[in-house]
Amino acid sequence: MAMLGVTAPTATAQVGAAKKIVDAAKEQGIVGETIDGYLALVSGSASAEIEAAMNEINIRRKSVYTSLARETGTSPENVAGVSGEKLVAKARRGEKVRLSNGEWQTVK
């Protein structure tokens, strides 16, 4: 099944101030991309601002995944998984990503 356009809608799901906050948190290793298509805290907790920004982006991503699933006749989880694979693959050097085994890895 081809999932065309998964990356572009995901990008639109993370606009504005929330993206800037999360990008900074990614650079610091506080937040990372997961293989299931959502952002997560790498360990422990983060500031309320970081958690709110991460949650905002995850809510927007879920909405995009749900819309794409309706359009393509698949599940939101399937769309999220395909998107997650792409987001993990695009992570920048030094950022953390959570793989399918649940372990965090630093991108080299």
Across the structure, where does each feature detected by a protein language model lie?
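Amphipathic, charged alpha-helical segments and their helix-to-coil junctions
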Residues: 15-52, 72-108
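Bacterial N-terminal signal peptides
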Residues: 1-5
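Short, well-ordered alpha-helical segments
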Residues: 54-69
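A generic structural signal for short
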Residues: 10, 53-54
